């Protein structure tokens, strides 16, 4: 899918369900909307805090892959400086 843009003029990941991980240990799974100087905007987002949950990040991802995104927030903006990595959820090996 690399290089294919669903909507010309939008980010390559626009409309794709992604796993976004931060340096602080937060993981977001949601539909990628856009990215600008303020950060990445996600829609219909599930959030996992590795420090505040009994559930490991790996189990959070496995459950999401199996049952779908359990939406915690309708939208989230993750500041660019906090993003460790972001990519399609479908690329994650669970």
Q: Which positions does each model-derived feature cover?
A:
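Conserved RNA-binding domains used in RNP assembly and mRNA/RNA metabolism
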Residues: 2-94
